A protein has these predicted regions:
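Non-catalytic cap/lid and distal C-terminal segments of serine-dependent acyl enzymes
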Residues: 1-268
């Protein structure tokens, strides 16, 4: 993008004690109007302690205020899919002692970041082995005038297929088509079946509060995952679209990822 992008990197307290040890990494994405330090400065200041408890390096990238973590088809200055899923991952693996394979990487986030985490994981399962979403904006079409989406994709009325394609739901239909007809209805091109998501390839964790304005689209995503026999965990709790909700939710996500990372290092 030809510009500096800031990130917060949180290391477990004992990172420096065993120089032979390699650590799994969790990429933690902020929501609309957030920035690289929103997670540690506002949402969950206890992330350093959490990283030490779970034994995970936590990386909080800047998502460009309202990038939705896309490579925008209308704004070349917004290429956050490439930045997070390729450039940042490569930089973190080169600078820190990481487990630099998909079995050592997870990605999650809240709101816009929940969308971004699932979107990137579905598009880059070779990079991320686990993913999550807290109150994620996983379907875009019901919100044609909100959160700068129109700036990134163009007006919905002019680009309905693009809005579908750039949503988590559209990426699910692409990655796990129920049949050829579902791909046709989604307006998605045919692809090599070998590129489709395999059962259990991604460990997926989704949660949303029952009073959240994204609750209905998260419930629909859960139902679509069930319909396509995609294993996942889905948690519903009382709560709204607030930092207080995500402060508690992130603890569950980090534990889910800890268990995933532990399974990945067990002898087969």
């Amino acid at each position: 993008m030809h510009k500096p992008v800031k990130n917060v990197v949180i290391l477990p307290a004992d990172y420096g004690q065993d120089t032979a040890r390699r650590w799994p990494v969790v990429y933690l994405l902020h929501g609309f109007r957030g920035r690289y330090d929103t997670w540690i400065g506002k949402t969950q200041p206890g992330l350093p302690e959490a990283a030490s408890r779970t034994g995970e390096v936590i990386v909080c990238p800047d998502g460009g205020y309202s990038s939705w973590y896309w490579d925008s088809p209308t704004d070349p200055s917004m290429r956050y899919e490439t930045y997070v899923a390729e450039e940042l991952v490569a930089a973190i693996d080169s600078l820190y002692r990481t487990r630099n394979g998909r079995g050592g990487r997870a990605i999650t986030g809240y709101s816009m970041g929940g969308h971004g985490a699932l979107y990137l994981a579905l598009r880059h399962p070779e990079t991320f082995g686990a993913c999550g979403s807290m109150s994620g904006g996983v379907e875009l079409c019901p919100f044609p005038k909100n959160w700068d989406i129109e700036k990134r994709l163009g007006p919905y009325r002019d680009n309905p297929q693009r809005w579908e394609e750039y949503s988590v739901m559209g990426q699910l239909w692409r990655a796990v088509p129920f049949n050829d007809r579902s791909r046709e209805v989604a307006g998605l091109p045919a692809q090599d079946p070998s590129s489709e998501l395999q059962p259990g390839q991604l460990a997926i964790f989704i949660d949303c509060g029952t009073e959240d304005y994204f609750y209905a689209v998260n419930l629909r995503l859960h139902e679509e995952l069930l319909y396509r026999n995609v294993p996942h965990e889905f948690i519903v709790r009382p709560g709204r679209h607030t930092h207080d909700y995500w402060r508690h939710a992130v603890e569950y996500h980090l534990l889910f990822f800890r268990d995933f990372f532990a399974r990945e290092i067990q002898p087969q």
